A protein has these predicted regions:
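Intrinsically disordered, low-complexity segments enriched in polar/charged residues with Gly/Pro
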Residues: 1-5, 53-54
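A general structural motif
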Residues: 22, 55-59
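STAS-typified acidic loop motif
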Residues: 3-44
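Helix-loop module immediately N-terminal to the HCX5R catalytic loop
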Residues: 43-51
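Amphipathic alpha-helical interaction surfaces in cytosolic regulatory modules
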Residues: 38, 43, 59-86
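Residue-level signal for alpha-helix termini/capping positions
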Residues: 51-52, 83
Length: 86
């Protein structure tokens, strides 16, 4: 079983709550980090592992009021990884 990944919200980064047990993947807030790699690399690593043992139902909630170009690149990478769920 995977550990839940929680990254607390800041004025420049969203709340990220990824839960393998429930299948809920939540992104909420603004995503304008100065270093998108620092924020999103752990997310990509978690999602890559998740698709190998995904919950039968996965609910992705992107409740982002704004995201910058760097964030959009990582979000697109994450979505591409999630398409591997069978």
């Amino acid at each position: 079983m995977m550990q839940e990944l929680i990254i607390e919200q800041t004025p420049k980064t969203p709340l990220i709550d990824l839960n393998q047990v429930t299948g809920d993947l939540l992104f909420s807030g603004r995503s304008i980090p100065e270093n998108a790699t620092k924020v999103y690399e752990p997310v990509l690593n978690w999602v890559t592992e998740y698709v190998l043992q995904a919950n039968p139902t996965t609910n992705l909630r992107l409740d982002l009021e704004y995201f910058n170009t760097a964030s959009s690149i990582y979000l697109a990478k994450m979505l591409k990884i999630l398409t591997r769920i069978n």
